[in-house]
Curated annotation (Swiss-Prot):
It comes from the Bacteria. One of its GO terms (biological process) is translation. The keyword Methyltransferase does not apply. Belongs to the universal ribosomal protein uL10 family. The keyword 4Fe-4S does not apply. GO terms for molecular function: large ribosomal subunit rRNA binding. It comes from Helicobacter hepaticus (strain ATCC 51449 / 3B1). Gene3D superfamilies: 3.30.70.1730. Part of the ribosomal stalk of the 50S ribosomal subunit. The N-terminus interacts with L11 and the large rRNA to form the base of the stalk. The C-terminus forms an elongated spine to which L12 dimers bind in a sequential fashion forming a multimeric L10(L12)X complex. This is Large ribosomal subunit protein uL10. Forms part of the ribosomal stalk, playing a central role in the interaction of the ribosome with GTP-bound translation factors. GO terms for cellular component: ribonucleoprotein complex; ribosome. Keywords: Ribonucleoprotein, Ribosomal protein, RNA-binding, rRNA-binding.
Length: 160
């Protein structure tokens, strides 16, 4: 890889990391190619970006994105997205499926370093769509009860 290619990769990653709401670093040592492709396909469908990056390039990109230093070692795969919950769910589900060869190392949520426990706890939260559904259910409940009451009143009057 030429120096110019490395510069382009670092610039691209710096912009991506700066715009991402969440970044998770995982160890993938021992994963087979088809398992890695499964992670990529699942991630792609959830608008999550996945890339294996050299640690030196990743450190430079993270520094350029004004994020805290992560002190990266060994083999790392980087996953990042705008939705922290969706990213956490995908990564934790995959880690549960392939726990012998895939493990979470560290994360950055809103440019703050988070540990594995935090990532797992975020993965247990309802998704954005589920939260919107819950909110709509709460908002429509009074109208639904009012209509049900009117319908019961109508049925009662028809019986009498």
């Amino acid at each position: 890889m030429t120096k110019q290619e490395k510069i382009q990769i670092v610039e691209y990653l710096s912009a991506e990391f700066k715009n991402a709401s969440a970044l998770i670093v995982c160890d993938y040592k021992g994963l087979r190619v088809n398992q890695l492709e499964e992670l990529r396909c699942t991630s792609r469908s959830a608008n999550i970006k996945v890339q294996v990056i050299k640690n030196t390039l990743a450190n430079i990109a993270i520094k350029n994105a004004q994020c805290p230093n992560l002190e990266l070692k060994d083999t790392n795969i980087f996953l990042w997205a705008d939705d922290q919950i969706a990213l956490s769910k995908v990564v934790c589900k995959f880690a549960d499926s392939y726990n012998e060869h895939f493990s979470l190392k560290v994360g950055l949520f809103d440019k703050q370093v988070v540990d594995i426990k935090h990532i797992v706890s975020v993965s247990k939260l309802p998704s954005k769509e589920e939260l919107i559904g819950m909110l709509l259910s709460v908002w429509t409940a009074p109208a639904r009860y009012f209509v049900t009451g009117l319908d019961n009143l109508r049925k009662q009057k028809e019986e009498n």
